[in-house]
Curated annotation (Swiss-Prot):
Listed NCBIfam families: aspS_bact, PRK00476.1
Quaternary context: Homodimer.
Site (described: Important for tRNA non-discrimination): H30
Organism: Prochlorococcus marinus (strain MIT 9312)
Residues that coordinate or bind ATP: R223, D224, E225, Q232, E493, G545, L546, D547, R548
Amino-acid biosynthesis as UniProt keyword: no
GO molecular function, one term: aspartate-tRNA(Asn) ligase activity
Protein's recorded name: Aspartate--tRNA(Asp/Asn) ligase
Recorded name of the encoding gene: aspS
Amino acid sequence: MRNKICDELNNTDIGKLVNLCGWVDRRRDHGGVIFIDLRDHSGFLQITINPDDGANLFKQAETLRNETVIMVSGIINERPKDSINKNLSTGKLELKVKDLQILNQIKNNLPFPVSIHDYENTKEELRLKYRYLDLRRGKLLKNLKTRHKIIKVAREFLDNFGFTEVETPLLTKSTPEGARDFLIPSRLSNGEFFALPQSPQLFKQLLMVGGLDKYYQIAKCFRDEDLRADRQPEFTQLDIEMSFISEEEIISFNESLIKKIWKEVLNINFDNAFPRMKWQAAMDNYGTDRPDTRYQMLLKDLGEVLGDIGFNIFTKAIKSGGSIKSITVKGGNSSISNVRIKPGGDIFQVAQDAGAGGLAFIRVKGDELETIGAIKNNLSEEHISDILRITEAEDGDLILLGAGDKQIVNQSLDRVRQYIAKDLNLIDTSKWNFLWVTDFPLFERNEEENRYEALHHPFCSPKNIKSKDSENLKKAIENSIANAYDLVLNGLELGGGSLRIHEANLQREVLKTVGLTDKEIDEKFGFLIEALEMGAPPHGGIAFGLDRITMLIIGADSIRETIAFPKNQQAKCLLTNAPSNVSESQLKELDIEITIDE
């Protein structure tokens, strides 16, 4: 049907007869001549139709509506100098139409303009419902091509290092991995269920037991969890696992992979090794294990200085084992008003939404500190000196403070730090600040349920566990650091991994520590324990979020912009109206009865 696409055309095609297919992006009538912007997947070309070219041809062109699918034949000409479009690669060319065929006419008015000129004015819910029209605009297609290139570069890199791509099952066993499973009822095994995998974690470990040595997969994963801008119920991981490998070797190899992707896709080189930070340092200084290091405002611990000044909130925080921390906003006296950091203000609300009761503040004015009386009246000169030294605050700076539970203080000041950095334009968006975060705790304590939870997952190996004595092993595990590592970019986790447990008794003990009984371990993970007893090699790996990598590379705000057919934030597909009801006969086949609470 066609012998060229728009973006292929150049000056060497002038005078040639070409056939093009595409959509009418816009039609304009000027001085008796019809100008049409023809759009295909590659770009645009202006085509012209003159009454002198034939009455029927001109009349047909007059009926064309935007998004009509057409095929045109004609001669490529050079545009007049006064009509050159410097914004297009084909902006110096136009097609003088000799023949026009309508391949498909649109039936009704479109729900939104497809033309790139109206791109920003369409609500996302409408874009998701008519995703095929949104794709046609070109921006999303470009995103998908970038995603394809990222995958292609990763595959070539891993292939060159002897990795084997293996597909692991999508219908598998429900195992506790943190989030809720999507369950699939089995028709043949009445009353039993498959689960869609939250990750290929256990299967890739079993591949190592099977001697594969080096594995990767572009893996679909599923988690039934609450959504946000960088989450989807189904998502894609670049999943990697290796045998006989150390933590240092995994970090070094995967750093090379990421550098290769950025080089090939963005033509950006990173000559130096990515910096590393231990988990505890990240929590102490940033309040999060995903720190954005493009700007300052580090958290500072003021517990020793302010814990005994007599201010009830501070005293209570320290006595209950909590903390008092601060961030310093340089020049904050002039850029942030009291209204914004008091109840009802936007910054106060950010802290409250993160779980904090509120924010205290200190304004530095020369040698004086301005704050509420309950704090100021109890500050000695030594207190003031210590505050200024620890916070590194100077005249004109604003100090914001949080007090209470350590986790909530960290979380709320982290959110406030991010919010203020965006609000005051403190972030250098041209920077790519990669960071390896290492030495995570193996567990975190869930005080409400009085039990331990794995910080990553219960298959991470603990560091420096030497004793195999059961009682000593239990104590050592509870206080252990994990052989785990995350790669963070500009405050977002790109990927995470660990060395895995490859000894059966150690794996059983770790699963017991997170609250499973021997019976539950055998029911849920018996196949893994059995495999580890049969000569499992030391192994480890990592999984990168492909959607998130693509989002950062293309500069989007949501991973929905990187996925062809994403769900909305209620986990619904607006295009197909899924999830949806199924017939009674389908439910009967599965022996499922649905009860709806009134």
